Amino acid sequence: MWWFRRRDRAPLRATSSLSLRWRVMLLAMSMVAMVVVLMSFAVYAVISAALYSDIDNQLQSRAQLLIASGSLAADPGKAIEGTAYSDVNAMLVNPGQSIYTAQQPGQTLPVGAAEKAVIRGELFMSRRTTADQRVLAIRLTNGSSLLISKSLKPTEAVMNKLRWVLLIVGGIGVAVAAVAGGMVTRAGLRPVGRLTEAAERVARTDDLRPIPVFGSDELARLTEAFNLMLRALAESRERQARLVTDAGHELRTPLTSLRTNVELLMASMAPGAPRLPKQEMVDLRADVLAQIEELSTLVGDLVDLSRGDAGEVVHEPVDMADVVDRSLERVRRRRNDILFDVEVIGWQVYGDTAGLSRMALNLMDNAAKWSPPGGHVGVRLSQLDASHAELVVSDRGPGIPVQERRLVFERFYRSASARALPGSGLGLAIVKQVVLNHGGLLRIEDTDPGGQPPGTSIYVLLPGRRMPIPQLPGATAGARSTDIENSRGSANVISVESQSTRAT
């Protein structure tokens, strides 16, 4: 035994990469860490340069003080020994190579190549850092050389503490940035999370409820756009469901009647069954053919409506004069007892050829249906401005009451008087759909206001442009209007351009 059940929809595939929240948080951490590192290097470099510059200034000041006091010349040994009570090391080298030194406990003033060059008189002054000391050597005017150094251990201790402070403060800054970035990202991406949950909800349950909108930023606009999409999807589903329901209702009546007639025909042809009179058989067969024609028309209308709802149209330049001519020929084959007064211009619409043809055909069919035998139907296509033309289809029928003029464009709507005539109630609905899809407008007015009958005129505003008029050989400026009554039979057609012009 086979059991059928509804297939559950596959869940949305989870991505293996980092979430947007984590990516934003990591980006914030990286940026803050980069800024902290750059600032730490800058602070360290500035403070280090300042401390070492201060040491150089201290050594320079101490040397100038010794030189200016004159003690080096009067009693160099005592002068140098006096420096032992300060925080520097000193050495005086006289021209006779007598050396006086005073050094801090545990320290030795280093003498290198730079200092020896000063002693030999090759350099006037030198500065260098060596063996944790900063050394200054100066050549005096009497030929002596003064060497002074200071330990860098206190400075290095300060710099070491500064490094730890910068490391700790930078780490705290990165951590705070990570926490703050996570909080801001979580709050900022909350609308995105709601959108994701709504999309997953729609995929799982077909629930099209809108999402609450908070604020007026970009994410709020994204939420509003998503809500618009949900509303459009809900309207599309509602139209689809209504179309299926209405189509089922409209198809049921002709199908039931057709089935009854076919069963009656089959029963009358069964062996031993009573035969129907010949005229009844003829009427029954004609009724079956009429019902089949009605079903074909209804199915065609439904296909056109669903095609327009789905947006399955190919847009191309369309010559409306040619559309009117072709539609007129089709209507005349069904109603050759109607006189058509047609006045058209060469107008080009960028749109769907099949849809525009069906729109024009339905308007003329509707006007012919409500016109008495021998009546007149007017079809006029005229230019209103540089980018708009107006198609008007008029009849002399009973007219449409004002309260029903909006309803006649609804699907399957049929007034009480229209139910006695053939039709599915979809013709003007298709007209409305095609016109709106092409950016046009519709309105209904009486052909003869106050007249009996008033008639009906349907006005269609179509955007487009005037078609260029090619000059034919031998044509004169006045030959702009051609009466093609003979080519139309009973149709009286007056065209602004000649028939041959529109056919090109």
Curated annotation (Swiss-Prot):
<feature type="transmembrane region" description="Helical">
    <location>
        <begin position="27"/>
        <end position="47"/>
    </location>
</feature>
<dbReference type="GO" id="GO:0005524">
    <property type="term" value="F:ATP binding"/>
</dbReference>
<dbReference type="GO" id="GO:0004721">
    <property type="term" value="F:phosphoprotein phosphatase activity"/>
</dbReference>
<feature type="topological domain" description="Cytoplasmic">
    <location>
        <begin position="185"/>
        <end position="504"/>
    </location>
</feature>
<feature type="domain" description="HAMP">
    <location>
        <begin position="186"/>
        <end position="238"/>
    </location>
</feature>
<feature type="topological domain" description="Extracellular">
    <location>
        <begin position="48"/>
        <end position="163"/>
    </location>
</feature>
<feature type="domain" description="Histidine kinase">
    <location>
        <begin position="246"/>
        <end position="466"/>
    </location>
</feature>
<keyword id="KW-0808">Transferase</keyword>
<feature type="compositionally biased region" description="Polar residues">
    <location>
        <begin position="487"/>
        <end position="504"/>
    </location>
</feature>
<keyword id="KW-0547">Nucleotide-binding</keyword>
<keyword id="KW-0902">Two-component regulatory system</keyword>
<dbReference type="InterPro" id="IPR003660">
    <property type="entry name" value="HAMP_dom"/>
</dbReference>
<dbReference type="InterPro" id="IPR036890">
    <property type="entry name" value="HATPase_C_sf"/>
</dbReference>
<dbReference type="GO" id="GO:0005576">
    <property type="term" value="C:extracellular region"/>
</dbReference>
<dbReference type="InterPro" id="IPR004358">
    <property type="entry name" value="Sig_transdc_His_kin-like_C"/>
</dbReference>
<dbReference type="Pfam" id="PF00672">
    <property type="entry name" value="HAMP"/>
</dbReference>
<feature type="modified residue" description="Phosphohistidine; by autocatalysis">
    <location>
        <position position="249"/>
    </location>
</feature>
<keyword id="KW-1133">Transmembrane helix</keyword>
<keyword id="KW-0346">Stress response</keyword>
<dbReference type="Pfam" id="PF00512">
    <property type="entry name" value="HisKA"/>
</dbReference>
<keyword id="KW-0904">Protein phosphatase</keyword>
<keyword id="KW-1003">Cell membrane</keyword>
<dbReference type="InterPro" id="IPR005467">
    <property type="entry name" value="His_kinase_dom"/>
</dbReference>
<keyword id="KW-0067">ATP-binding</keyword>
<dbReference type="InterPro" id="IPR050980">
    <property type="entry name" value="2C_sensor_his_kinase"/>
</dbReference>
<dbReference type="InterPro" id="IPR003661">
    <property type="entry name" value="HisK_dim/P_dom"/>
</dbReference>
<protein>
    <recommendedName>
        <fullName>Signal transduction histidine-protein kinase/phosphatase MprB</fullName>
        <ecNumber>2.7.13.3</ecNumber>
        <ecNumber>3.1.3.-</ecNumber>
    </recommendedName>
</protein>
<dbReference type="Pfam" id="PF02518">
    <property type="entry name" value="HATPase_c"/>
</dbReference>
<feature type="topological domain" description="Cytoplasmic">
    <location>
        <begin position="1"/>
        <end position="26"/>
    </location>
</feature>
<dbReference type="GO" id="GO:0000160">
    <property type="term" value="P:phosphorelay signal transduction system"/>
</dbReference>
<keyword id="KW-0460">Magnesium</keyword>
<comment type="function">
    <text>Member of the two-component regulatory system MprB/MprA which contributes to maintaining a balance among several systems involved in stress resistance and is required for establishment and maintenance of persistent infection in the host. In response to environmental signals MprB acts both as a membrane-associated protein kinase that undergoes autophosphorylation and subsequently transfers the phosphate to MprA, and as a protein phosphatase that dephosphorylates phospho-MprA.</text>
</comment>
<feature type="region of interest" description="Disordered">
    <location>
        <begin position="471"/>
        <end position="504"/>
    </location>
</feature>
<keyword id="KW-0843">Virulence</keyword>
<keyword id="KW-0472">Membrane</keyword>
<dbReference type="GO" id="GO:0000155">
    <property type="term" value="F:phosphorelay sensor kinase activity"/>
</dbReference>
<dbReference type="GO" id="GO:0005886">
    <property type="term" value="C:plasma membrane"/>
</dbReference>
<keyword id="KW-0418">Kinase</keyword>
<keyword id="KW-0464">Manganese</keyword>
<dbReference type="InterPro" id="IPR036097">
    <property type="entry name" value="HisK_dim/P_sf"/>
</dbReference>
<keyword id="KW-0378">Hydrolase</keyword>
<keyword id="KW-0597">Phosphoprotein</keyword>
